[in-house]
C-alpha cells in the first residue's frame, strides 16, 4: 500500500522498520538487494509515488518495511517539498508501530544536515537505528574504511550508539550484515521466495538511476566540522 499522508496509512499496529535517506542515497537499490528482487523498486522518470509513504510486508502484515520519501527532493517544486517535509515529520512523530530506522547515507557525503536531524530525532524517540554508508564501491577499501571510522567517531561525539556498516548494492558488500540486522528485528531471512506486494512498491526516481552512473573516482567530502553546530540543538525534523 502507498499513502500520500499519515491519515491514509495502513492501520497503526504491528512492527515497522522505515528506510530513510536523501533522494539519491541509493535507497531503492538497497531494498532491491535486501529482498533479492531486481524490480522491487521499479524505475520511473518522474518522482510520482516516490513521494508517498510505501508499505510492504515480509509475508506477515504485522511486520512491515516502509520506504519513506527521500528528503532533498531535488526535482520537486518547493511547495511539494514543504508538504512532504510536514508529512514525513507527522509519520516520524506519531507512528506508534515505527520501531526503528535504516538510515542510508552516500559514503561520499555522510552526515548531511537532514541526516543528523534524523539521528537526533530517532535518539529522542529511543528507536533503534542502523546506518548504511551506501555506494561503498565508489571508494577504494582504505578510504571507505576511513570514512566508516570517521563517522563512528562523530557518532560517539554526538553520544549516539547506533550500528553502522559499509554497503554496496552493486557488489553486494555488506548485504549479509544488513540481512542479519533485519533478522534480529523481523521474521526475515535473505530468501528469494519471500512474498512481496508488488502493487505497493515504491518507484525509483530518475535521479536515483542517474546517480548509479556517477564517476567512481569521486572522493568523500565528509568533514566533521559541519556537525559541531548541530550537537547542542534540540532534535527536530
Swiss-Prot record:
GO (cellular component) term, any one: cytosol
InterPro entries registered for this protein in UniProt: G_ENGB_dom, GTP-bd, GTP-bd_ribosome_bio_YsxC, P-loop_NTPase
Pfam families attached to this UniProt entry: MMR_HSR1
Sequence ranges of Basic and acidic residues compositional bias: 227-237
Binding site for Mg(2+): 28, 50
Chain spans, region Disordered: 207-237
Cofactors: Mg(2+)
Keyword Cell division: yes
MF (Gene Ontology): GTP binding; metal ion binding
Keywords: Cell cycle, Cell division, GTP-binding, Magnesium, Metal-binding, Nucleotide-binding, Septation
Record-level GO BP terms: division septum assembly
PROSITE patterns for this protein: G_ENGB
Comp. bias regions, Acidic residues: 207-220
Residues involved in GTP binding: 21-28, 48-52, 67-70, 134-137, 167-169
Location of the EngB-type G domain: 13-188
NCBIfam families reported in the protein's UniProt record: GTPase_YsxC
Function: Necessary for normal cell division and for the maintenance of normal septation.
Family stated for the protein in its record: Belongs to the TRAFAC class TrmE-Era-EngA-EngB-Septin-like GTPase superfamily. EngB GTPase family.
Record's protein name: Probable GTP-binding protein EngB
Organism: Acinetobacter baylyi (strain ATCC 33305 / BD413 / ADP1)
Gene this chain is encoded by: engB
Amino acid at each position: 500500500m502507498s499513502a500520500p499522508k499519515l491519515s491514509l496509512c495502513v492501520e497503526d499496529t504491528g512492527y515497522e522498520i522505515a528506510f530513510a535517506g536523501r533522494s539519491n542515497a541509493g535507497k531503492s537499490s538497497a531494498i532491491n538487494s535486501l529482498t533479492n528482487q531486481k524490480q522491487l523498486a521499479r524505475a520511473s522518470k518522474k518522482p510520482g509515488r516516490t513521494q508517498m509513504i510505501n508499505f510492504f510486508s515480509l509475508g506477515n502484515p504485522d511486520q512491515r518495511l516502509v520506504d519513506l520519501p527521500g528528503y532533498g527532493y531535488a526535482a520537486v517544486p518547493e511547495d511539494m517539498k514543504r508538504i512532504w517535509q510536514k508529512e514525513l515529520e507527522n509519520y516520524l512523530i506519531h507512528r506508534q508501530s515505527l520501531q526503528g530506522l535504516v538510515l542510508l547515507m552516500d559514503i561520499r557525503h555522510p552526515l548531511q544536515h537532514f541526516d543528523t536531524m534524523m539521528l537526533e530525532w530517532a535518539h529522542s524517540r529511543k528507536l533503534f537505528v542502523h546506518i548504511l554508508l551506501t555506494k561503498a564501491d565508489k571508494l577504494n577499501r582504505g578510504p571507505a574504511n576511513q570514512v566508516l571510522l570517521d563517522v563512528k567517531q562523530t557518532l560517539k561525539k554526538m553520544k549516539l550508539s547506533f550500528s553502522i556498516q559499509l554497503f554496496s548494492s552493486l557488489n553486494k558488500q555488506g548485504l549479509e550484515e544488513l540481512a542479519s540486522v533485519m533478522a534480529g528485528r523481523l521474521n526475515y531471512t535473505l530468501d528469494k521466495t519471500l512474498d512481496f506486494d508488488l502493487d505497493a512498491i515504491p518507484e525509483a526516481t530518475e535521479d536515483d538511476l542517474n546517480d548509479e552512473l556517477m564517476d567512481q573516482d569521486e572522493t568523500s567530502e565528509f568533514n566533521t566540522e559541519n556537525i559541531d553546530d548541530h550537537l547542542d540543538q534540540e532534535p527536530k525534523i
